Amino acid sequence: MYKKEIFRDLDKKYNSHLYTGLLGFFMNQCHKRLENFSNNNKHFNKILEIGAGSAPHYSYIKHSYDEYHIAETSDYAEDFHKNNPKVKLIKYDGKKLPYEDETFDRIIISHCLEHILSPEEFIQEMMRKLNKGGILSISLPTDPGLAWRLGRLFIKFFTIKKTYNISGEEFNYMNATEHVNSIFNLISIIRFNYKGKFKEDFYPLKLKMSDINLFYNVHIHK
């Protein structure tokens, strides 16, 4: 969850901040739209979700599957899932996924890649863990696009004190240290490395412009 020690106690308030009200509506729609891909009616043997936190994606999945694995870095997320019979959780270092290559039919990473210091290398790491014909599903905020910045400004002045009990300055610092990768750089990395192998979806508008949307979903086929 949150990387900085001073924000660790906010892990417990993550869902009340992101999954309630208008923001919660958009977040839920983002999860639902991540299930819109060409072969989402097939059966997947093994699924891996990376960084599920306290808002796992499995409740949105439309297709059938046999096993649902979660790879996590935080103690809070580990405790959140430890008694869940639906998942097989493993804690890892945030860099190397502790699985054999070509293990999973689908890998899901929702609102995590913007936090990872070496995103290109981590995408390659995820692709190695996919079986041939597998799919990597990525969901991202369009930070620092214009629409996202306007939304963050609203949160800073009207909701962050109520939900997190932190100041606007602390909120700015939290975002500066958490969202270390811009949506523009991440999209460029994906488009350059996986030409002809991906399908994009912008939300809430369909125009492929980060500045006028809030979320970016992409599916990369191996």
What do the PLM-derived regions correspond to, one by one?
Residues 46, 66-67, 135:
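Residues at the starts of beta-strands that form the adenosine-phosphate
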Residues 25-44:
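Conserved alpha-helix/loop element of class I SAM-dependent methyltransferases that forms part
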Residues 53-96:
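Class I SAM-dependent methyltransferase SAM/SAH-binding core
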Residues 95-107:
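A short acidic, Gly/Pro-enriched loop at the edge of an enzyme's catalytic core
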Residues 8, 13-25, 29, 117-127, ...:
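S-adenosyl-L-methionine-dependent methyltransferase catalytic module, highlighting the catalytic core
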Residues 43-53:
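Conserved class I S-adenosyl-L-methionine
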Residues 106-117:
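A short SAM/SAH-binding and catalytic strip from SAM-dependent methyltransferases
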